[in-house]
Amino acid sequence: DVCSSDLFESVKDRVHASRLTRDYAEKLRMSLREKRVVPYFQTIFDCRTGQPFAYETLARIIEPDGTTLSAGAFIETIEKYGLGRDLDRAIIEQAFAAARERLDTPGAPPFRLFINLSAQEIQGRGILGYAEMLCAQLDIPPNVIVFEILERDAIGDMTHMRKFLSDLRKKGFLFALDDFGSGYNSFHYLRELTFDYVKIDGAFVKNIVKSKVDRTLVRNLTRLCQELGILTIAEFVESEDILDELRGMGVDYAQGFHLGMPVSRMA
């Protein structure tokens, strides 16, 4: 009957999805073993001067045939199989080496390097300890590094998290809240933790020219951050019209395909 058929199809779909996730996990493990997980860098620009201000580090998987995949496509697999730490370590190690190379480049202007971390990884503390150790080894000033905390992650023990981040801030590291405005956690984090930067969710930014609602949201999120003394970064800037709107609102920094695609070296 129809119900049995639907149930069979549903189970079949779940089995297929589970097998696909398992295949992705093996692909990712192999990529890590073969050192084919690499950082790409997307430039973040100063809205006032138009000059590069920072680089966001993005994980990419290089397939054996040379095809490049975004690690974002594997996010469910990474979380399910606990591969976040290995991925973060691989990316941080290479990104910090690239930062050291950039610092050694004659005439290179000052810059900041943004690194994405999940709240779970930060709470595990091993990753931040590793980053701190690498900074010391490579003689990278801690204020070059900005750790981005993803808004969608829930933090279990906020008191411990606050103390831990406070200790790192005292050492000079900086923090950004990613995807601001996309959920309840945004405002909870803003109340409980101290951030140097807020990245306004690109889902709002990309529609500000056409949508009065999104334009109003971005303007008011920007104003909120200004009153709190937090610098703003707009994601998903896909046209000059969007950039003009953001400048008019007083957004500090911007990134997106209109300004620059992610590339394998800091431009």
State where each predicted segment sits:
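Structural preference for long, well-ordered alpha-helical segments in enzyme cores
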Residues: T77-I78, I91-A99, Y130-A131, F164, ...
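EAL-family c-di-GMP phosphodiesterase catalytic domain
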Residues: E9, D13-H16, C47-Q51, I61-P64, ...
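Short, small-residue-biased leader/transition segments that mark boundaries at the very start
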Residues: V2-S4
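Conserved long alpha-helical elements within nucleotide-processing catalytic cores of c-di-GMP signaling
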Residues: G72-E76, R85, S166
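Nucleotide second-messenger and two-component phosphorelay signaling modules
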Residues: M30, E34, D46, P64-D65, ...
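Catalytic core of bacterial c-di-GMP phosphodiesterases, primarily the EAL and HD-GYP domains
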Residues: T49-F53, L83-H160, F236
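C-di-GMP signaling machinery
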Residues: D6-V38, T77-G84, E121, L128, ...
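A short, well-structured catalytic beta-strand-centered motif of the EAL phosphodiesterase domain
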Residues: Y40-E76, A95
